[in-house]
């Protein structure tokens, strides 16, 4: 794994002769050079996320330039983001063309499907100098009529004026909404904040506590479903109106305020970091169990 947004990475790509391709997941722009958050991220306030579109665009442009110069295939993994950022996906959003792109069930309107797209020289099934030497691609679920129909309908709707209008001012709209929610949380002195990459949001905690994970249950009492894993992502539909969002913000603040009032944001003063204490407790419990056995 090479570091993102790093001159050293570009140097490696320029000088090594054994690199065939570079795979990029554009979602990493929300937290470059950090693994996907796990449940452990709920135990401390060390988690950070910040999306800088201009900086990540410059990085992708530099990466594209090096890949072109060295004959390296640039691949975008858009299974998660799909067409959330722009009608043309991350390629259109960042203004950088990949050689190959992967998509998932977004293209199938929610039906299970995997799609690989790319330029002709990488997608053709034979060499021009050996046309009979064909690369077969087979699968028992290939070209399923229902899935193909759903994909065609999705692409038609994606190209319609109605859907195209949803993308106008998308970043400005969702950045303003994230700022609005953070302001409401700050007004209530709640140790919770959000960071966003357009309509993909992540929940952050300002104070370390072994009970931060309980926010998901308080949100559920307000009718909001936060993933039970440590990712804490909120994925919004692009057609959310301002009225829809204000209702979500009201419920989010109400849930966090209830959790605070019930005392679950409390952190023990003058003690070792929560994560370190939990590791000790876990090891102690395992050792005790082994002695009993």
What are these regions, as identified by a protein language model?
Residues 1-293:
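Conserved N-terminal phosphate-binding loop of PLP-dependent enzymes in the Aspartate aminotransferase
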């Amino acid at each position: 794994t090479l570091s993102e947004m790093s001159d050293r990475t570009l140097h490696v790509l320029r000088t090594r002769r054994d690199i065939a391709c570079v795979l990029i997941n554009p979602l990493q722009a929300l937290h470059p050079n950090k693994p996907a958050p796990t449940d452990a991220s709920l135990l401390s306030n060390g988690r950070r996320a910040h999306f800088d579109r201009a900086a990540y665009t410059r990085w992708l442009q530099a990466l594209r330039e090096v890949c072109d110069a060295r004959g390296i295939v640039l691949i975008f993994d858009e299974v998660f983001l799909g067409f959330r950022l722009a009608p043309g996906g991350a390629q259109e959003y960042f203004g950088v063309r990949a050689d190959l792109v992967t998509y998932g069930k977004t293209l199938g309107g929610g039906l299970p499907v995997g799609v690989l797209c790319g330029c002709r020289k990488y997608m053709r099934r034979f060499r021009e100098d050996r046309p009979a030497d064909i690369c077969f691609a087979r699968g028992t679920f290939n070209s399923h009529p229902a899935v193909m129909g759903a994909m065609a309908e999705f692409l038609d709707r994606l190209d319609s004026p109605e859907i195209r209008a949803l993308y106008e001012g998308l970043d400005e709209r969702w950045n303003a909404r994230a700022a609005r929610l953070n302001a409401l949380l700050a007004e209530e002195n709640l140790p919770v904040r959000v960071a966003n990459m357009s309509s993909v949001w992540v929940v952050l905690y300002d104070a370390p506590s072994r009970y931060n994970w309980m926010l998901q249950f308080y949100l559920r009492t307000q009718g909001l479903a936060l993933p039970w894993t440590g990712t804490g992502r909120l994925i919004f539909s692009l057609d959310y109106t301002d009225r829809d969002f204000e209702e979500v913000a009201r419920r989010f603040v109400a849930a966090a305020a209830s959790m605070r009032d019930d005392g679950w944001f409390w952190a023990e003063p003058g003690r070792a970091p929560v994560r370190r204490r939990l590791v000790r407790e876990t090891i102690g419990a395992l050792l005790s169990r082994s002695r009993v056995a």
